[in-house]
Amino acid sequence: MKTLSSGGELASIRNRIALVDPTDSPLWGSMSAPQMICHLRDAFRCPLGERVPPPFKATLLPALLFKWLALWLPMKWPPGVRTPPEVDQRIGGTPPRDFQADRAGLLATIDQFARGTGPWAPHPMWGQLTTVEWMRWGYLHSDHHLRQFGR
């Protein structure tokens, strides 16, 4: 299973982020490429305790089942999952400013996250996660949005 605790997978995600262009169009969803860069940084800042979104509940599946399926089912995350307002760049997330600076900030935050061992802030839907679970989430969330922009 791919995680950000693997140096090779972390390098792969970093390289894919470097390929994102501010003019890239999404293959799904309504986020722009600059918004996606800021969204990912905001999301990585949550387990680091730098952003604290309010808890929210899964609507279709119990949180523990949803967590297990999302993290360990061997399939890619599907398009169309709604973004919580606190990390939606059009509502409560950090708005894009300077693309190169925003991307550099994301890369620095991912590096900080990948070096981490906790303690971690709780996930807003799934509660406390282990370091292994957070590293898996980090890979999957990044991969999902990079695929959204063909990267």
Task: Write out the residue ranges for each language-model feature.
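Globin-like tetrapyrrole-binding proteins
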Residues: M1-G7, I17-L19, P85-R97, L106, ...
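Short, contiguous alpha-helical
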Residues: T23-W72, Q112, W120-R151
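Charge-rich, low-complexity N-terminal segments
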Residues: K2-S5, E9-G29, Q35
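Short, helix-capping/interhelical loops that line the mouth of catalytic, cofactor-
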Residues: L48-G105, F113
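Membrane-proximal intrinsically disordered regions of secretory-pathway and membrane-system proteins
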Residues: S6-G7, L106-I110, Y139-S142
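Short, flexible active-site-proximal loops enriched in glycine and acidic residues
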Residues: P79-G80, G118-A121
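Charged catalytic carboxylate motif
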Residues: S12, H39, G105
